[in-house]
Amino acid sequence: MEAGYAEIAAVQFNIAGDNDHKRQGVMEVTISNLFEGTLPAEGGIYDARMGTTDHHYKCITCSHQRKQCMGHPGILQMHAPVLQPLFIAEIRRWLRVICLNCGAPIVDLKRYEHLIRPKRLIEAASSQTEGKQCYVCKAVHPKIVKDSEDYFTFWVDQQGKIDKLYPQIIREIFSRVTYDTVVKLGRSKNSHPEKLVLKAIQIPPISIRPGIRLGIGSGPQSFHDINNVIQYLVRKNLLIPKDLQIVRGQKIPLNIDRNLQTIQQLYYNFLLDSVSTTATQGGTGKRGIVMGARPAPSIMRRLPRKEGRIRKSLLGSQVWSISRSTICGNSDLHLDEVGYPISFARTLQVAETVQHYNINRLMPYFLNGKRQYPGCSRVYKQITQSVHDIEGLKQDFRLEVGDILYRDVVTGDVAFFNRQPSLERSSIGVHRIVVLENPKISTFQMNVSACAWYNADFDGDQMNLWVPWSVMSRVEAELLCSVRNWFISTKSSGPVNGQVQDSTVGSFLLTRTNTPMGKNVMNKLHAMGLFQTTQTDPPCFANYSPTDLLDGKSVVSMLLKQTPINYQRAPTWYSEVYAPYMHYNKQDISTQIRNGELIEGVLDKKAVGAGSSGGIYHLISRRYGPQQALKMIFATQQLALNYVRNAGFTVSTADMLLTPEAHQEVQEIINKLLLESEEINNRLLHGDIMPPIGLTTHDFYEKLQLNALKFPDRILKPIMNSINPETNGLFQMVATGAKGSNPNMIHIMAGIGQIEINTQRIQPQFSFGRTLVYYPRFALEAQAYGFICNSYIAGLTSPEFIFGEMNGRFDLINKALSTSSTGYANRKAIFGLQSCIVDYYRRVSIDTRLVQQLYGEDGLDARQLETVRFETIMLSDQELEDKFKYTGIQSPLFEEEFSRLKKDRDKYRQIFLNVENFNFSQLLTDVRQVPVNVASIVKNILLSSTSGVLPFDEKSILQKYAMVKTFCKNLPYVFINNIQERLQTPIPVYLKRAAALMRMLIRIELATVKTLNITCEQMSAILDLIRLQYTQSLINYGEAVGILAAQSVSEPLTQYMLDSHHRSVAGGTNKSGIVRPQEIFSAKPVEAEQSSEMLLRLKNPEVETNKTYAQEIANSIELITFERLILQWHLLYETYSSTKKNVMYPDFASDVEWMTDFLENHPLLQPPEDIANWCIRLELNKTTMILKSISLESIINSLRAKHPNTYIMHSVENTASGIPIIIRIYLRESAFRRSTNTRMATDEKIAVNVVDKLLNSTIRGIPGIKNANVVKLMRHRVDAQGKLVRLDNIYAIKTNGTNIFGAMLDDNIDPYTIVSSSIGDTMELYGIEAARQKIISEIRTVMGDKGPNHRHLLMYADLMTRTGQVTSLEKAGLNAREPSNVLLRMALSSPVQVLTDAAVDSAVNPIYGIAAPTLMGSVPRIGTMYSDIIMDEKYITENYKSVDSMIDML
């Protein structure tokens, strides 16, 4: 009878009690001895029944040696019970809620029935139970006190009498608790409180203890500390009397009390870490045991942290053998090849089973042995099931079928190649090994274009390489992890690889028109030589004579025709910036490839560069597959490099030198910048700088200086005039996108300009206001603050060099400090999203809980997308009719077609105009990513056709229209199946929406007016190709899209954080570095956000085009507190007087004059009789009042309304220049009195509190709006003719701070277009769906052009909002989303705490996702393992072919 097979569906966690320990234990530890002679002592802590770690003896329980024995636990029967150290808090809860006399609950259990199970006992224990009378025995419940200086001692305080609760007493109390009480308080029967006090503790198996005997030979033997702790525990236990009985309130001997306490401490140290290094009781609250000079180790210490069992052993990948070395470039290798040193190849072994078909190939390895490469090291003999070293074999040893040969690595083997950190799945790729025969080479070699997969370079990076052993693993590796699978990026949907640096320049030079001296014109022989190393099918040169000349375009076309494509785009080489300074050949300003032939233009970064979405290699990959694209990259690279080697290309210092005239012009530009900076300095010295609200004078001055010292665009003019673009290597590198940028060129040739550290100029760090010792005190010239006039080629002075090094040092430190934060953020994202897997309906779910109804809302794989343009979007109604309405045949069908196109256009506009209105910077565009480029398919079909121009046929036109209409109608069935399509079952709305964009594009590109020259057969072929590509673009079942999203967001987010020092200081916001990403992913509430902002559109269209009116509204909503209007204030203790008779502070004696005038002008505002001696004198900032349009009257009225217990006097508003506005606020006696009319003891404290309230008083504005500025917006609208018009004269208000509700109450603000960056504020007012959209837009705003495909952002947003509340990606968010997945939460962090809570709650953990199955030792259901494979064994048996029968058939 065969054994059954089943998978573990779930795991339940419970508290283990005495019975559990006894049932699992194989023996009882009774003595503290370890060994008797060379064998373990029977009954000791090394008893052989618990396993073996020594080769001298076997395990008595299972009779296995040390490698096969898994270990078996033992038990230690305690003479006195001990508390379970992991559940001290749980013990205290139970003691608070149950009667110590009868075990009945003290609290009313019905009050907690509405709570979820885990919360019931916690809430009951937090209620007031002291002094309550038991409902059953009427005993009064005492106060339970936990010892402040001890971790596990409880005291009972009853009417002043304090008794100690020993574990034995607690055990007796808990034994009286009924199971019904346990269940009603939310705990499981398996978590009865009696289990929290143990009489029998478990001794772990020997095999899992951290160590064994360390002492060997003479001298005392040494054992690992954890064994010593167990030894002490056994010895102390023997000192306790077996029949010890402890009665509550009874005194016990001091020595026994100390022994009981020591046993409890030893058990604590045995399970948990010791936090104290003292062996006696101290003030830390816990006692610890010291082993020599270090605290004792523990069992639980092995679980957490990176080196713990969970992360290192259970979740970490392990291989038998691995190699690691530095990488270097080798362009002779294919992109999917890796050069492997021969010394490594002879060390790393590959296991290969001998078969009939490979025995002849393996025999040379067997004969060579270890003496000669390629050889082998050992042989596994199937008959004897033993391993033999190859050097110790006898002469008659034969290699037979079924044996396993451990041979050397040879060329052609597949290997995993990896560079850490592995932030993306492309960080582990499979390459084919090419063994490097040169023994002096000891580095891995790879093609320079392959670095993009690993984010590697050749500045000392090291990588890992290991070879899979079994045939199955080798096949899986090649199919699943081959680098061709990573050619298209999941993050950006574009190609990862392409030409870099030299090959980019070489491709440009080879394909240029009229190259100087005709360098790219060659004869037949030279053209054939360029193809020598391409390793492709050589083109036919038979049609060319030796004297015929070929240009570079012809040579490249010979290569491109092997994979014909159509391509048209402007190259990187052509730039409007350079156009005024150089002459462009008309044939080089647009690159066009038609059916594989380069008609015009050049190949540069935009066409063949790495990461060029929509470039040549992207199109080849989409049409012919990624393997062909990789071959074409290598072939083009070889062509370009061979050409560069022959024609020559270099960058020398001559390319970096300016002519004297150009140098003079550069100096004039720099001198103008310095002059402007000096003018700003003069304005500062004369007090003429007026900063806006929210900025200090210093901050505004620095901002003016930064703007003034920026190099203008015209500095390129002298550079371009002094170089020859046709021959200058540096310029060609920059212009073609091979390397460098315009700022790099300016720094090298003209000047470096202002050095910024953290977006600020160099600030004075030395004493006495100096930036460096080279400059005097308080120097204001730009050079003293980091402005470098010289260029790199001209050389830097000492202070200039130091300024440059300061910037480099800041970047270095910034990167080092950010690495740990970004690494942990990546790990949290991986664990938070890893359970999201695509099911058979292409839904995304966590186990059975839905996250997305359809992945990415369209079910498409991010790697299978192309960028296309929707032609109808920007057209007016008349333009749309002229271009797309077919009038050749009078039929209502074509009216219907045009109406459908118009509706599609309007729908598209409506959707994306709403997106534009509710985002800060995402403007409407007619370019989108779709799975099928319909225009390209049509073009390819027409180019491959030989029928020419066809006459119009009314019947065929109607037939083609019907075909397209039917196809668009049935397109959503691609998500279902053909059966449902034949039955025409109703299509769900969400599937119709998923295919909406694709159907729009098909109707546009296959409109009747555009397909007149297409036959019905061609139309059928086009539609079939569209359906095929669309189907192939769908996401695969079992895809771990959560991990893909985490990797795609975390990697560019890491780069964003490292580049945070480039942020802008404008606007007063702080969206920099790690702050804003943490706010988004941590789901912080509104009050905790540091960088929230709002964009407010104005309701009146006339006002939103007037900046002055918009600024007035911005001033009115900006929160102005009294403190912002004050220059200085004083709290004075003086007697009020309106004359000079009474003594006043001498500095303010002049106030009497305006105080007298105030009383004369305001006869109704006479001082009250109860004025106290406390006065607050304030001087107002007139400049701020003018800029914010705040009158003195409004300030006084606001203060009087909010502070009635004061008497306020003020000077006139229109004071002379230089004389401030003064307000005196006198406190009244009522402010110092209680309701009992008794005077408070500290009048000064009350006066200070009143000052604080005064300063924080709101004068005007919306709470939460710290700053409001007018910004210029760019938006679209549809005019009366139906044309999409771009408006760039709209003014809106951008605020620092958020309060959507407050903004909606303002009559000047349009409530329908309020945009807030705060997820919490959006959620509070608009609901969870709005918060979901806000998460997407905020991640996109933060990451900018480095943002990933929007499907990954949707994954983040849907997961964070799935529960109906915004949950974070932190530990708390994971607990809320997946409370039952204990193993996943344990793998993320704090495994001890997670396991403890799970045991208390008796949690049941269903096994799903990735972490849980991995921890349980099974394979997660993802990818190719998602689907079960059903095998018909009967069919296989009946159709089995032996080797002989196959030979006979052949």
From Swiss-Prot:
PANTHER family: DNA-DIRECTED RNA POLYMERASE, DNA-DIRECTED RNA POLYMERASE I SUBUNIT RPA1. Catalytic component of the DNA-directed RNA polymerase (RNAP) that catalyzes the transcription in the cytoplasm of viral DNA into RNA using the four ribonucleoside triphosphates as substrates. Forms the polymerase active center together with RPB2. Part of the core element with the central large cleft, the clamp element that moves to open and close the cleft and the jaws that are thought to grab the incoming DNA template. This is DNA-directed RNA polymerase RPB1 homolog. Pfam families: RNA_pol_Rpb1_1 (PF04997), RNA_pol_Rpb1_2 (PF00623), RNA_pol_Rpb1_3 (PF04983), RNA_pol_Rpb1_4 (PF05000), RNA_pol_Rpb1_5 (PF04998), RNA_pol_Rpb1_7 (PF04990). Lacks the typical C-terminal domain (CTD). It is an enzyme of class 2 (transferase). It catalyses: RNA(n) + a ribonucleoside 5'-triphosphate = RNA(n+1) + diphosphate. Transmembrane segments: none annotated. SMART domains: RPOLA_N. GO terms for biological process: DNA-templated transcription; DNA-templated viral transcription. It is found in: Virion. Its main location: virion. InterPro entries: DNA-dir_RpoC_beta_prime (IPR045867), RNA_pol_asu (IPR000722), RNA_pol_N (IPR006592), RNA_pol_Rpb1_1 (IPR007080), RNA_pol_Rpb1_3 (IPR007066), RNA_pol_Rpb1_3_sf (IPR042102), RNA_pol_Rpb1_4 (IPR007083), RNA_pol_Rpb1_5 (IPR007081). Keywords: DNA-directed RNA polymerase, Late protein, Nucleotidyltransferase, Transcription, Transferase, Viral transcription, Virion. Part of the viral DNA-directed RNA polymerase that consists of 8 polII-like subunits (RPB1, RPB2, RPB3, RPB5, RPB6, RPB7, RPB9, RPB10), a capping enzyme and a termination factor.
